[in-house]
């Protein structure tokens, strides 16, 4: 149910032109502890993989878009295909599938009480939902293997030191920090620029340097034709806040 609710909320936020950034956080004392242990117990008694394929996939606006990489149409991994920035405010324990969800966010802000753990190895499972792809890109191969093998607990402060979190803040300032970052993006940055740069960064993970340069050159030509570029120059010269058009 959580995955369905998240997909519905992401869809609503993406389709609302007034929303420029999306914050995902947990209800209660934790961000997301992963799969329900009772469900895992039922799966193990039923012989394993039955029912796994029934997990909710990407929202329809992503799943039905032919221009989206199929890799970003799976459960959890669709966050990179969302055209708006997604900020994960990690407010407590985050494990397993919950960690995968956080890894696919664009920005992660952790509370000091946050605890990150992969948990997979202690459940007899493997790195699911793209964790083996995303985690090394954030913390490096050695740290990723350590976290995956040991399933040890990583604090919010260590997560920031590793690059797993962009910031570590006091618990009582977590949401204020996330909202301030989202508001900064909404007030100062062109939504189209964020959309295109997000596409560039995730595409570059599977491109050669030359392919990434070619894409950048094509997108720069298109950017110079936009009202965003005109406004970007105008507000700087006129020394006023920008008024960028919505995507």
Question: What is each PLM-predicted segment?
Answer:
Residues 1-27, 41-46:
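Conserved CoA-thioester-binding segment of acyl-CoA-metabolizing enzymes
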Residues 3, 37, 72, 132, ...:
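A general structural signal for well-ordered alpha-helical segments in protein cores
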Residues 12, 109-114, 165-214, 243-247:
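C-terminal long alpha-helix characteristic of the crotonase
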Residues 45-70:
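A short acidic, glycine-rich active-site loop
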Residues 75-83, 89, 95-149, 162, ...:
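CoA-thioester-processing core
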Residues 107, 146, 150-152, 158, ...:
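Well-ordered beta-strand positions
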